[in-house]
Amino acid sequence: MAETQPLVFVLMSISAILTAGLPINDDASLLISVNPETQQLVDSLGRERFFHGTNVVVKHKPYHPSVEGYDNTSFSEVDMKILQDLGLNTIRLGMMLPGYVPTRGNYNETYLKIIQEIVSKAAKYGIYTLLDMHQDVMSAKFCVEGFPDWAVNTGNADNFPFPLEDKYPLNLQTGYPYPKDCAKHAWGDYYFTEAAAAAFQNFYNNTDGLLDAWADFWKKTAQGFKDYKSVIGYELINEPFAGDIYRDPSLMIPGVADERNLAPAYDVIHKAIRTVDEQHSIFFEGVTWDYFAAGFSKVPGGDAYRNRSVLSYHYYEPPDFNKKFQFEVRMEDLRRLKCGGFLTELLTVGDTAKDMSDMLELFDICDQHKQSWMGWLYKSYGCYKQHLGCLTDSMHDETGHLRDIVLQNTTRTYPQAVAGHTIGYKFDRITKKFDLSFVVTADCRSTESIVYFNKDLHYSNGYDVTVFPKDSVTWKQVEKKIIINHSQKLSAGTTVTFSLVAK
């Protein structure tokens, strides 16, 4: 486990962030796409880009964080400065269906403007945004959240939560089950109710035009963000369920629902998005139990869109069970589909020794496979207390301060941009040693690589740098980044190495 600093140091660090006003950069000004041959995210200069980030998801009204001040409801410029200081250069921001389309066909343009404001401000701090249509078990009708009532069609399955229990009584004022009844089961169990399964199937089947409405939501969203280069992509849906597993039990077989239900639906949404936005990447996700391989045979839209497609995946234990094996499976998915990959959720806020061990092991595995990640969750925004699909609380304690355990272990030394093809990188959380190696490529139009490092936390006694080839590589420190420049005279295929060692 990484060595810890006194909590007073943590609080002083937060205080300094809140008052100092970190320099603003334009790192989020370059459009991100995918190199299908390497399956790496790249910017418009041809540099490979790597992201560490967090989730900012508000699952209840008003479906967005407050944009002013600093408290448990905010994601303001104060919060953005904190993330920038920690080296977190991306957020997964809830772009919520009930927030934007509260009633069918009626779009809340005020909501869109607030999300646009958050995206624009975050970009000033070098933070890219993934827009995520987040949901957990679809609806408050099923004790959780995600879809407005108009988008939930259970057909004849009105016996929720059967087969977990007999039908719950409904609150006549809200039309939803009572919270005390919902609390009888873990929220994830409600996916496997007959009513929720039927509602997902009706959504995929375009019953009552619901798939068309989903596509319209994304078309309108893409129209609003097509010119925002700091949008890293559109995530079509969070943790989609398989569909009606009671009518078709084979949907429970890993990969089957991806092929039968999700892939056709994603193609419909892709087509709608591409009528207004040909640039941004689409993030697509399989069911949560794709243990052996995702069931997709192609990316949404087909092979021509491999360079704008990213397979989004999560890792939690349970339901996942073997980190090394399942990452190998995901990497094989990326090689097969020739698309990018992104771990868009992992637990970064757990309190147990196992939570900590799992998180640190996942970070190391992500480095090994050159994968970007986003932790769950920056702030709870009330979702834990409201039984809205949160496994645990957030990066913040009840007073609004960043928790010591989070600060120590999510701010890691890593490359944010590499001017070539990355061979590998590694951060040793005990010794703080960091190594990076990459190959100069002919198609990269930049010689500048960027490494984030938290000097105050990890290198407070100073550091030493070693580069190779010595006569062709220079470096300089700019705040909490090291800028590495290699000579334009280096030929393609030349290996460049960089090492950072704490004194």
Swiss-Prot record:
It is an enzyme of class 3 (hydrolase). Glycans are attached at residues 72, 108, 205, 307, 409, 485. This is Endoglycoceramidase. PANTHER family: ENDOGLYCOCERAMIDASE (PTHR31308:SF3), PTHR31308. It catalyses: an oligoglycosyl-(1->4)-beta-D-glucosyl-(1<->1)-ceramide + H2O = an oligoglycosyl-(1->4)-D-glucose + an N-acyl-sphingoid base. Residues 1-21 form the signal peptide. The keyword Transmembrane helix does not apply. Completely inhibited by Hg(2+). Cu(2+) and zinc have no effect on enzyme activity. Lithium, potassium, manganese, Ni(2+), calcium, magnesium and EDTA have no significant effect on enzyme activity. Enzyme requires presence of detergents such as Triton X-100 and Lubrol PX for the hydrolysis of glycosphingolipids. Taurodeoxycholate strongly inhibits the enzyme activity and SDS completely inhibits the enzyme activity. One of its GO terms (molecular function) is endoglycosylceramidase activity. PROSITE patterns: GLYCOSYL_HYDROL_F5. Pfam families: Cellulase (PF00150), Glyco_hydro_5_C (PF18564). One of its GO terms (biological process) is cellulose catabolic process. GO terms for cellular component: extracellular region; nematocyst. Optimum pH 3.0. Highly stable at acidic pH. Its EC number is 3.2.1.123. It comes from Cyanea nozakii (Jellyfish). Hydrolysis of the glycosidic linkage between oligosaccharides and ceramides of glycosphingolipids, especially b-series polysialogangliosides. Belongs to the glycosyl hydrolase 5 (cellulase A) family. Its main location: secreted. InterPro entries: GH5_C, Glyco_hydro_5, Glyco_hydro_5_CS, Glyco_hydro_b, Glycoside_hydrolase_SF, Glycosphingolipid_Hydrolases.
